[in-house]
Amino acid sequence: VKKRPGTNAVMAALAASALFGASTPLAKQFVGDMSALLLAGLLYLGSGTGLLGLRLLRDRGWRRPGLARSEWPWLLGAIGCGGVLGPVLLMLGLASTSAASASLLLNLEGVLTALLAWLFFKENADRRVVLGMALVVAGGLLLSWPGPATGTNPGGTGAALIVGACLCWALDNNLTRQVANSDALYIAGLKGIVAAAVNIGLALAMGQALPASHVMAPVLLIGFLGYGISLALFVLALRGLGAARTGAYFGAAPFMGAAIAIGVFGESTSPLFWAAGLFMAAGLWLHLTERHAHPHWHGTLQHSHPHFPDMDHRHDHP
């Protein structure tokens, strides 16, 4: 019987994509106020402290996360790729790229996530999804095409840095999939705290100073919502969809970011930008209308944590 992937998992993936998509044009507004290292660190500081604070409230104190020893290498690898390298590369890329173009380039994260999931983690591939990925790549190539230094058509270094960030997050997504049945708030919160400590520590060691509180506060809030809550929802989606399909649904994020960059911040665009957007939108449509009917087998899941917020209704149990 053909059926759509679990509705709750899909909604979690789309909510995660909306929050993360909004964070890109918002974070770009602070690129000139601090270094890429410091900005990435503060974004993840907001994420980590906010999520671990929610976890403490949920559990009314500290509870052991219940991670098996064999799961720690996966989680630490995810933190290194997605929490340390990815955001720094993105902030460096944003310095020479418009938020609208950077947002659309982030569609490549879903492509790279799916490729890694299919090649190394043996997830199933669907022809519609493969065609959709090809359209997204075509759009990415258009956005990366060298052009005038207007910021609307990055080309060169800016695009390469953002593609590098996408690869880091694709690795992160597949590594996180290996521990996705553990406490989502703990996984996302720990990733934020470690990423913040590394990035802020490096920035301070290089002689950089923390920004004023009126600059730091909105950055922390953007990090909490766009990186923290978004990541917790993403982990929940991974449980029901796997890395490849969660990455495909997450493809809505770049369009949210581009819409904010153009509609709110008035960024200019180019014909190549709109052509790329059409390719990527067509690719996303193929992902969202995907149906699959291959057999699934899930091992028994043992949950040792209460669900927050109402997490038992946000993912399917076997």
Over which residues does each language-model region extend?
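Glycine-/small-residue-enriched transmembrane alpha-helix faces in small-molecule transporters
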Residues: 1-43, 47, 151-178
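Cytoplasmic-side transmembrane-helix entry/capping segments in multi-pass membrane proteins
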Residues: 10-14, 68-78, 125-137, 159, ...
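Helix-helix packing/entry segments at the starts of transmembrane helices
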Residues: 17, 40-42, 87, 101-108, ...
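Specific transmembrane alpha-helical segments of multi-pass solute transporters/efflux pumps
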Residues: 18-24, 52, 56-101, 106, ...
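Hydrophobic/aromatic residues within transmembrane alpha-helices
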Residues: 30, 39, 43, 93, ...
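Transmembrane alpha-helices of multi-pass small-molecule transport proteins
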Residues: 33-85, 112, 168-172, 188-207
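Structural signature of hydrophobic alpha-helical transmembrane segments
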Residues: 35-47, 92-110, 154-167, 213-227, ...
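Hydrophobic transmembrane alpha-helices of multi-pass small-molecule transport proteins
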Residues: 51, 116, 128-147, 199, ...
